[in-house]
């Protein structure tokens, strides 16, 4: 997961002298921790939520602002990937798609504890 830190002068004069920075935020090289994530969203509590797209069991994986990873959910239906994740505007429901059979789940919190 890459993180972009904008310049204090983003899109204004002075940006070239003090540009934003793209940095590697988290790179877990252990497929037991997270595998082939290709969708993400920001949770109401500030963590990232990643969707796995691996060859076996699929998870929703949380990433805290300091880079710690945790399992948030698991596809117990089949081994199809999660494809897209987002929270409702009020932050009470998480919506996530399972690619096959092409369904969307609405999952209610409570989410206040985060990871």
PLM regions and their residue ranges:
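Sequence/structural signature of beta-propeller domains
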Residues: 1-115
């Amino acid at each position: 997961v890459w993180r972009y830190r904008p310049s204090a002068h983003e899109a204004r004069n002075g940006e070239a002298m003090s540009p934003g920075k793209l940095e590697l935020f988290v790179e877990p090289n252990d497929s037991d921790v997270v595998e082939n994530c290709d969708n993400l969203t920001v949770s109401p509590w500030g963590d990232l939520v990643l969707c796995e797209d691996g060859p076996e069991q699929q998870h929703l994986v949380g990433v805290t602002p300091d880079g710690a990873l945790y399992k948030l959910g698991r596809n117990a239906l089949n081994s199809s990937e999660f494809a897209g994740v987002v929270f409702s505007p009020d932050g009470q429901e998480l919506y996530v798609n399972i690619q096959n059979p092409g369904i969307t789940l609405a999952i209610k919190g409570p989410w206040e504890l985060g990871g």
